[in-house]
Amino acid sequence: MSYITFKSKLIEQKVKQYLKKKHADLLVKEGRRVLVKEEGALLITKMLIHNDDLQSEDLADLQMFPNIKELQLLSENITDLESLPPLEKLQKLYLNVKATDYTPLVKCKKLKKVEVYDSGVSDIAPFCELTKLKELKLSCNKLISLEGIQRLQNLTELWLDRNQITDIFPLAWLPNLEYLQLERNQISDLSPLRALKKLITLRLYHNEVKDLSPLKHLFLEELDLEQNKIEDLSDLVGIETLRNLKICFNPIKDASPLLKMPYLEFVCTDAEDIYLPLERYLGKIVVREVFGGQYPNFQEADTYIFSKKE
């Protein structure tokens, strides 16, 4: 009978915990030791390790689990991904580590969902090799350039918030995008988004946007424009699919375009000269002040939510 030889104590512990609950017959006790039969490795399809004791070299043990489909690794002591084996069935990957080179991820060719959060990613190139990706989340990193991302033609969901991005031109070549998160960058030009006809949700909170004309022919349902430099909302009037709109903290000079958008179900604004006309002329809109609470992201006392009456 063959047993698994572990090098990583953490991975060994995770495997034994799983098998003890569901496949205890694959654990064999010899004296004070508990051994894992080799066939037990084939039953591991998901592994989640959130522990700073996990080291870079521990990743080599993952080669014994060829059926892993989902992997989550959170550790400040993973600084190198070179030991990550080519997991041929891996489809979902979440990393919160301190690596500097993400090139080893290209060994996992079947990845469909990848999230690398707050991990110092400065080069998007390795992710552009993962052409089967449908969801890519690179929030809170150090990205400046998006060049190469146009190769990811299957992407439907993309998170790039809290980076250092100014130019989004490569996004023009991602026709299947439905959800785009670009909060807290330095983006001013939205023209590359004109071609994204499948885009439903767009989040642009805390950027440098002034011109909304590139959005006028899209079919957006949810749009977050808070904390930009927007003065004119008239380009939004023709987006009849739009239901949720956030426009707080913009120097908006004229609220009248909103009165031509009766299809809106939710509007967030901080300006009295905007919410009063809405309240007066659109009877289906109800106003509620927000002081945190139900909407904890809104801390300012002069923020108002408008939502469609039942």
List the predicted regions and their residue ranges.
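Concave beta-strand-loop units of leucine-rich repeat
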Residues: 43-57, 61-79, 83, 89-104, ...
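LRR flanking "cap" motifs
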Residues: 2-64, 296-303
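Short glycine-/acidic-enriched loop or helix-start segments at secondary-structure transitions
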Residues: 257, 278-279
